[in-house]
Amino acid sequence: MNTISRRQFMAGAGILGADVLLNGCAKKEGDKEVSATEDLMREHGVLRRALFVYSEAAIRLRSNPSFVSADALEKTAKLFRAFGEEYHEKRLEEAYIFPAVKKAGGEAARYPDILAEQHQRGREITDYILAVTRGAKLNANNAKPLASALESLVRMYRPHAAREDTIVFPAWKQVLTAKQLDEISDKFEDIEREQLGKDGFESAVRQISDIEGELGLADLAQFTAHISR
């Protein structure tokens, strides 16, 4: 994603608490507007790439732990924590999106509590991954438990992110006016800069790209499905 500018947040009269949530984010990429939900899903793209690293690492850990870099897994976990858990989940979803969706009611309102519980479980698993990989060499003693932890995180977050992308985020956007979309956009931009610094998204993309390269996962063509005939 190219560097994206967001307009400054101006709280509208009468928009308080969870109602601020119902503001969306519109960004400009060149002359093209990018919606808040699209931006949230782009952030999910970074996290999905981290989950793919985890899933591939789990396979290798079960066959030959020496082929898995503990340092690469630690860097992935640190990225997942900083970009996913501390920024995307806590500062955007839990602070703004989930309260608004619950307040709006409807089908989507039953998801925020479940999603928040899964966020917490994910943080516990990230704690474990960081503890195992920090300055350690992976071997037969820690490889299988780590593989199980990685697999459980991937299994949880795949349907988790899919429900957010297809149910929760669209429900959030549906209750927004165009003005509210503009207002929340800059609030999210302020949060991103405060939490991650300038070019936070682009930095996250570079980090996960470097990790993929380190683990031999950078070439997309290698994952093209083969058909048995």
Regions inferred by a protein language model and the residue ranges of each:
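Small-residue-biased structural context
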Residues: M1-R229
